[in-house]
Regions:
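Bacterial N-terminal signal peptides
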Residues: 9-18
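Short, compositionally biased P/S/T/A/G/V-rich stretches that sit at domain boundaries
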Residues: 23-48, 139
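Aromatic/hydrophobic beta-strand junction motif of beta-rich domains
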Residues: 47-55
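Solvent-exposed serine/threonine-rich low-complexity stretches and specific carbohydrate-binding patches
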Residues: 73-90
Length: 139
């Protein structure tokens, strides 16, 4: 094999390796956009959760201090739960902010968010089409 053909193979391998994290970030047609994994959102402000969703049904967002999933594959919603609305092809959810010390957006730490689509038509036995869990920090 010539050096020129080896460089083509190497470039192709790099492109494929770079594409795989994006593929892994989508589950059941739900792709989280922001906050991104391991991002830090400012304490005392409400972030906007954004996701791209393929398929019909309502889209909901859960925020939890734990990444543990229940039997349906979704995390708890103890910190926040809300219905996302579609704006320009992207679903968005901005939690209501409460200005007291114990509120989660005023409590620095690690949190997890997950979007899921509710679609029960067509004989689907599991109505919750959950997306990937994303770890982020409030700080």
């Amino acid at each position: 094999m010539t050096l020129r053909s080896l460089s083509g193979v190497f470039v192709t391998a790099l492109l494929l390796a770079g594409a795989s994290p994006a593929l892994a970030a989508t589950k059941h047609g739900v792709t989280p956009l922001s906050p991104k994994a391991n991002a830090t959102v400012p304490s005392g402000q409400s972030p906007t959760f954004k996701m791209r969703v393929k398929g019909k049904g309502q889209v909901w967002v859960h925020v939890c201090k734990s990444n543990k999933k229940n039997g349906d594959g979704v995390i708890c919603s103890e910190e926040s739960i809300g219905r996302a609305s579609k704006k320009g092809g992207v679903f968005q959810y901005k939690p209501k902010f409460f200005d007291f010390d114990e509120f989660w957006l005023n409590s620095p730490g690690t949190y997890y968010w997950q979007a899921h689509r509710i679609q029960c038509e067509g004989g689907v036995s599991d109505c919750l089409q959950e997306g990937p869990v994303v770890k982020f920090k409030v700080g």
